[in-house]
Amino acid sequence: MNITVISVGKLKEKYLKQGIAEYDKRLSRYCKLNFIEVADEKAPENLSEAEEIMIKDKEGEAILKSIKDGMFVIALDLAGKMLSSEALSEKIDKLALQGNSHITFVIGGSLGLSQGVLKRADFKLCFSPMTFPHQLMKLILLEQVYRAFRISKNEPYHK
């Protein structure tokens, strides 16, 4: 199984880099993990709705260029479906059984994802109605993917 995480912006915080590196190492027994970071656009305070859409569209274009044919795309979106850890594990298992060997998770920037990216998504996933910094979301996502693989293999961790 190949898993790609496409995110907006460069990861700068050392503690997040360390956490992501730890889950990258843990996940290596279950999947091949790839990271793609696309440039984030400057978003000044008090944007108009049109300016917000323009920024999301520009980031979205870069995201869409990174998505290859054959990838099953899961967009992280507040309007997406919430799943338990067990349900995420089942979803990943089911995708593998259906022949989807490449899952791509997409994390938007501070303004979220463009409509183009949301339309391209095969599934929209919401982790919580709360908003998280998009860089922290990458670490939370990897922890949940790791937990999903452990659940799937009936290995201790998720209790």
From Swiss-Prot:
S-adenosyl-L-methionine binds at L76, G108, F127, S128, P129, M130, T131, F132. Keywords: Cytoplasm, Methyltransferase, rRNA processing, S-adenosyl-L-methionine, Transferase. It catalyses: pseudouridine(1915) in 23S rRNA + S-adenosyl-L-methionine = N(3)-methylpseudouridine(1915) in 23S rRNA + S-adenosyl-L-homocysteine + H(+). InterPro entries: Alpha/beta_knot_MTases, RlmH-like, tRNA_m1G_MTases_N. Its EC number is 2.1.1.177. This is Ribosomal RNA large subunit methyltransferase H. It is found in: Cytoplasm. The keyword Methyltransferase applies. The keyword S-adenosyl-L-methionine applies. GO terms for molecular function: rRNA (pseudouridine-N3-)-methyltransferase activity. It comes from Alkaliphilus metalliredigens (strain QYMF). Homodimer. Specifically methylates the pseudouridine at position 1915 (m3Psi1915) in 23S rRNA. It holds the Pfam family SPOUT_MTase. GO terms for cellular component: cytoplasm. SUPFAM superfamilies: alpha/beta knot (SSF75217). Belongs to the RNA methyltransferase RlmH family.
